[in-house]
Amino acid sequence: MQNKGFVRVFAILLTLVCVFYLSFSFVTRHYTSKAKEFAKGDVKVEQDYLDSLANEKVYFGNWTLKQCREMEISLGLDLKGGMNVILEVSVPDVIKVLADNKTDEAFNQALATAAKQATTSQDDVITLFVREYHKLAPGAPLSQLFATQQLKDKVTQKSTDAEVEKVLREEVKAAVDNSYNVLRTRIDRFGVVQPNIQSLEDKMGRIMVELPGIKEPERVRKLLQGSANLEFWETYTAKDVTPYLQAADTKLRAIVASETPAEEADSAATEAPAVAQATSTADSLAAALKGENKTQTADLAQIKKEHPLFAILQVNPSGQGPVVAYANYKDTAEINRYLSMPEVQAEMPKDLRLKWGVSPYEYDPKAQTFELYAIRSTERNGKAPLEGDVVVSAKDEYDHYGKPAVSMSMNTDGARRWAQLTKQNIGKSIAIVLDGYVYSAPNVNNEITGGNSQITGHFTPEQAKDLANVLRSGKMPAPAHIVQEDIVGPSLGQASINAGIMSFIVALILLMVYMCSMYGFIPGMVANGALVLNLFFTLGILSSFQAALTMSGIAGMVLALGMAVDANVLIYERTKEELRAGKGVKKALADGYSNAFSAIFDSNLTSIITGIILFNFGTGPIRGFATTLIIGILISFFTAVFMTRLFYDHFMSKDKLLNLTFSSKISKNLMANAHFDFMGKNKLWLTTTGAIIVICIAFLATRGLSQIIDFTGGRNFKVQFENKVEPEQVRELISSKFGDANVSVIAIGTDGKTVRISTNYRIEEEGNNIDSEIEAYLYETLKPLLTQNITLETFIDRENHTGGSIISSQKVGPSIADDIKVSAIWSVVLALIAIGIYILIRFRNIAYSIGSVAALACDTIIILGAYSICWGWMPFSLEIDQTFIGAILTAIGYSINDKVVIFDRVREFFGLYPKRDRFQLFNDSLNTTLARTINTSLSTLIVLLCIFILGGDSIRSFAFAMILGVVFGTLSSLFVASPIAYLLMKNKKGTEPAVEVAK
């Protein structure tokens, strides 16, 4: 083998990279175990322990625990539990605001039509709106709609339609970006570990948010869907507010003393000045938490009795500026509780508002210290004197000294009020507040007129950009609404982990046994070693991407292992052929690798094509599956083709392993001299296939498919009861209360206690409280089946499984459902087209392309038909969802592998035997690849059966579709793709009678 040195170096470097990234997971597991041991079951103490170490360098002196947790392999929501939502910023609402809410009939009608068409069209709302408006108002320029005060610097009466459309796209993108920034900040403040938030670039206005470990979904819904509230406030100085804080601390001391037993209150303590005592409080708390200084812990407890507030709040000693105090982030909740007490509020001025800064104190970010600002309310109604809706634009730039700054422009009304506000606060600070947190508090040097301002300070370029984003958020024209939602309880996630690990281990063991039994111990173990390396490299690469490992990702990994065996099977089968031809082991193995390479390359590349399409058109779990599948295929190509070759070359260069036969007693003569007349009955095969296709289409037309809410829109609730229930009993209860809404109930698992309830009840309605109202309504409806003492709070608690509760839920809005349906159709069609084009390019004969695509289309129709025939009476769900579409595409990718291998052999035989008739040539090609076809199919079926039996309910339907795909894909290679390709080519050269094969 050439380039051995490169392969070795690459393998070593890849191994080091994978070890490096996987090591972070071991570090975090170590500290998580220490936290659990320290906490002894107290979740809050465990989290406080980890938080106290978050910014400590715990790995090689370079990486903090927080950074290590960001680098580890995280678990997806279906394994860890949590919440996945897709939010949508209404593009039509944004366009209305940009047009100043015009009442023009053509404008409103065009916008309404565009919004409706967008659910099924591949074009976005802006394109559809422009097209419809031109139909309704021919010749009317778009500038007459959008030459508004808000867009005065971007659109004029002379602007062309193309220029206006460009501005609309920029403004809509800015609105979505603003929403993204607001959501990101809210989530960061919420304290979720390893959140994932991303704009869905292929869908205008949509943002996906994944929040692992969430236990309060209703709180999250309100957090995510609330409108951004940007405000400008006047401020106090620290020296003005410190006396009030001292009075509050004194009041709290009395409150704490009254709550403390008398014998504890008698302890003698030396009273030090409150502010001085609080100076090192953050360090003391961290040390106490870790148990490093018991004396310090006792002293701290005494300080908190004497000065409850100042023990955790350090007053600004300079007395200058609006920052009155500092506190560690884990103490902010307790400080808020203290400051909200009526007794403490009575000590404060009526116009004082205390608000936290949004980010840690810039001079001490490691300690996670936050600043407390003193806001002054001067309006009678208690509102801010100026709000963000007056901001027209904001951008980050550099001032005349070359330092980062932020420029801001306001509308006419805002400019007038801004001039008044700045005039009254010369020499003081004005706080910029978003969602209740202070982002900046610049000092006013002089009155600002005209509405144009420049904010300067000690900004980094990133901070200037963030502040500009905040200011732009103030004019966000439409809040984001949840259009899709999935909630998984942690115990359900643990069950998925157990099922996934079990299916993975059993599949790996069976694959190893199978390879050894078919090809002998040493070749089998070499192939098995490649599988282990495949797993190691795949996990390492996933870790380097900071990707989350999901149940579908585990399935993709397991399936990639099954498909990885295909490369070893191809190599070993070709090697056996060369050995039977009389070659020595060295030469046979070298030729085996060489002759199998093109088939391995083409089959892997076609699978990657379907994986890429799957990734681009899928969302959530489908993307996770596609990612692991693509990585697994790429790695399997490297390990099977190059790494195993290094092993054999190393030993055979020393004249070792020269007695290998690459077979066992079981497989020695398996299909070695097969002479099946496949082509002689090609018309029978095609007629039979045609009849099956007609039957499948008839069932699809009459019985249809059981579509889940991914395609219809609606809500799913997976409910676990204390006792066994009948699905029909549950359905009747719900149907009697949910009116005309569609309701379906199916059993989940085998214990008879868990059901999945699907309904489209009130799915068209939007609002922050709709989901909680429906959960409450469901609780009232199912009360007769619940344990008597179950409350609503217990019922909706995803962690509770006693007496009956919701353990997971899912919501898919109508617009999302339509998009998923369109994307599913396009993904399958594009996969077929892409594969057909690739086969044409590689084999340079359209007969191969037509045969392949026709066979793949047959596979797809037969799988759909089987689901149509079987749903309703099989003991597991056969509903059509995004995962099923993923299975279809994966089956297509697997099926084309087989066809590529056969056609590659046909192409090879054309070169070796140019005078042999096509009839015999096709038969010989099918017979010589039959052993590979059987071995690959069996090895893949072993994996799929493990997933099907052991993988759990969530992945069983996927495995069933894949099993159908493997079975029918193998058959279609022999009885559809090959006969069609043969029939299309046979007219180019005469055929000989079928008896010629038997000579």
Over which residues does each language-model region extend?
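Hydrophobic alpha-helical transmembrane segments of membrane transport and translocation systems
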Residues: 8, 12, 533, 538-541, ...
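Juxtamembrane "pre-transmembrane" interface segments
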Residues: 210, 451-454, 462-509, 777, ...
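Hydrophobic transmembrane alpha-helices and their membrane-interface caps
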Residues: 517, 521-571, 849-908, 975
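Pore- and gate-forming transmembrane helices of large, multi-pass membrane proteins
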Residues: 183, 491-511, 563, 578-619, ...
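Juxtamembrane segments of multi-pass membrane proteins
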Residues: 698-746
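Interfacial helix-loop-helix hairpins and adjacent transmembrane helices
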Residues: 1-17, 21, 25-69, 73, ...
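Non-transmembrane, solvent-exposed regions of membrane trafficking/translocation machinery
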Residues: 23-31, 51-60, 68-435, 439-443, ...
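Cytosolic juxtamembrane regions of multi-pass inner-membrane proteins
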Residues: 562-606, 647-655, 868, 874-936, ...
